[in-house]
Amino acid sequence: PEQAREMCDTARKLGKVLAYDFHHRFALDTQQLREQVTNGVLGEIYVTTARALRRCGVPGWGVFTNKELQGGGPLIDIGIHMLDAAMYVLGFPAVKSVNAHSFQKIGTQKSCGQFGEWDPATYSVEDSLFGTIEFHNGGILWLETSFALNIREQSIMNVSFCGDKAGATLFPAHIYTDNNG
């Protein structure tokens, strides 16, 4: 926290903008979809799903599996990027409530995946986390994130939006309507 404050203070003193790496905000797909949402193309968005899932993708290097040093698992490593992209496209609606459940089922059992090996005996972060964010405008956002989850795909990184006029996905950006039948 102290280093983050120093970085912020330095940026202010130099008249610079300090950006924490939420790089998906600046992707062309994100910018274009945000513009369409702002222009009402999707109508009232009532369900959003942000997914950052890995089947067997526990990072086997660094401190990713150490809760004391890392602070958490897939939510703060990969899930936060899809959550930020979703919130950015939605225009950061006011949050009414948050409910989440985390699980530690796989990382403590085995130690080999697409990103190397780790020590199951010292694995202390969640394998997966699932949450619901309810907004004051009545909409909800479902968040799904995992380092290790028994799913078919090796990786799913996407955000979907369901509005009363159209739906959309973010990576790549597609809008789905019934305008032409």
Task: Tell me what each language-model feature is.
Residues 16-19, 24-122:
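Predominantly a Rossmann-like dinucleotide-binding segment in NAD(P)-dependent oxidoreductases
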Residues 6, 81, 156:
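Short Gly/charged-rich anion-binding patches and loops
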Residues 1, 27, 152:
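Loop/helix-junction capping segments adjacent to catalytic residues or to phosphate/diphosphate-binding pockets
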Residues 1, 18-20, 49, 143, ...:
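Hydrophobic residues in well-ordered beta-strands that form the structural core
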Residues 84-179:
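Contiguous beta-strand/loop segments that form the cofactor/metal-binding neighborhood of enzyme cores
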Residues 1-17:
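Rossmann-fold NAD(P)-binding glycine/threonine-rich loop
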